[in-house]
Amino acid sequence: MTKKEYKIHIIGAGISGLIAARVLENHGYHPIVIEATDRVGGRVKTDIVNGYQLDHGFQVLLTSYPAVQKHLDCDALELQSFLPGACIFKSNDQKTIGDPLRNLSLLIPTLKSGIGTFSDKLKILKLNQKLKKKTLEAIFLESEQTTLEYLQRLGFSNAMIKDFFKPFFSGIFLETELGTSSRMFEFVYKMFGEGHATIPKSGIEAIPKQLLSNLKTTKFNYNTKVESLKDGKIILENGTQLESHYTIVASEASGLVSKLKNQSIEWKSCTTLYFETDTRVINKRLIGLISKSGTLINNIFYNSSLESATTPLKEILSVTVIDRRGLSNESLIEVVRTELTELCGITATSFIKLYNIPRALPKLQDLKYEMMPSETRLTDHLFLAGDTQLNASLNAAMISGERAALGVIESITSIV
C-alpha cells in the first residue's frame, strides 16, 4: 500500500488536528479531516460583526512558545504586541505596572503605582532570573502545588497577590482562586517573560487559517459529526460508516470511544462581552485588571489599541467574566455595564456581542510538557491529540498534534 492509499482520518479541525495533518502531509500521507462545524479553528475563532473584529474569548498568542516558533510564520500573521504590564483598577484609581527592563516607559508608572512592596518587586526580579535558567521540561517535573501556595511560599505579600497575581492569572487560568498547578504558573510566567503577548492583525483565527493554507493534500469534510468509533470504523451521526486504517481524535474523545466513556474532561468556562465606546480610559496597549474581590469583571482590554485588519469607527472594549453566576445575558450585560462605570470610569457603552464559552480550557491534573509519539496511541489504530493530553495551552495543542501524527507514522512504518 502506498502512503497516499492509507485512510488516515483526523477528527477535529482545531489546532491539534491541523498540526497533525501538516505532519502527515510532510511525510507523504493524504489525511482526511472530519470537522463538526463549518470552518477550522476549534476554540480559536474570530468573527467580523458590524466592522469589528471579535475573537471568541480574550485569546493571545505567546511568541516564545517553542511550538509556535516551529509551526507558524509569525511575520505573516502581522502580530500586534501588548506592552509587558497591566493597568490595575483599585479603589476608584488606576495604576500601571510592568517590566521596565523590557519597556522603559513603564519604569516611572511602576515605581509610583503603590502596587506591591519593594520586597515584592525584588521577589519578581528573583523569580524572573530563576525561571530564565529553568528549562520547560524541568518545570513540568516539579512537584505540584497550587499557584496560590507557590506565591505564598515565595513570600509575596497578600496585597501583591490580590492586586496583581490573582486578577492577571485568573484571566489566564479561568479560575479565581489560583488553584491551578504551579507547573502551569511557572510555564506561563516564563513564556510571558521571554516573548511577547500578541494578537494577529486579522484576529486569533488567523492562526488556524494559516495552518490550513499550508495544507495541500488534506481533504476536509465540514459540518460532519462523528457519533462513535468502533473496530476501524468511523460512524457518523447520519449513520454513514467510514473505513479508517488510522484515526486521530483531535477533539474530546470520551463521547466517541467506549473505553473512555467514564473519563470525560471537565472544562472551565468564561464569557466575553464586547462594547463600543467613544474613548479609552487605558491609553497604552495594556490589559486592565480589576483587583476588587467579588466582581463579575476579571479583566478588560481595548482591542482598538492594537492595529487590526478592519477599521472600527469607535473604540472596541472586550470584557472577560469568569463566573457569570447564573445570570441571564440581559442581566449580565447590565451588571457589567454598572461595574465598568463604578470600577473603571467607563460610561456610554454600546453593547455589540456576547460570547459564552462553556469549554474554554480543560481542567487537568498531573500536567506534562511533552509526550512520546507512542503515548498518544489508545489502540493499534486509534490515537489521541489535543491540549487535554498535556496542558491547557496552544503550545500543548501543537505538540500533541505533532506527536499523534508521528505515532501513526511509527505504527505504519513498523509493519511495512
List where the protein language model places each region.
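Mid-domain catalytic core of redox enzymes
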Residues: 227-334, 342-343
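Active-site/ligand-binding neighborhood in enzyme catalytic cores
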Residues: 126-232
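A short alpha-helix-loop-beta-strand transition element characteristic
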Residues: 46, 69-90, 157-163, 267, ...
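Hydrophobic/small residue at the entry helix of a nucleotide-binding pocket
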Residues: 15-16, 40, 400
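Conserved flavin/dinucleotide-binding core of flavoenzymes
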Residues: 309-416
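Dinucleotide-binding Rossmann-like beta1-alpha1 core, especially the glycine-rich loop
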Residues: 50-130, 134-138
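N-terminal Rossmann-like FAD-binding beta1-loop-alpha1 element of flavoenzymes
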Residues: 6-33
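Glycine-rich FAD pyrophosphate-binding loop
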Residues: 25-49
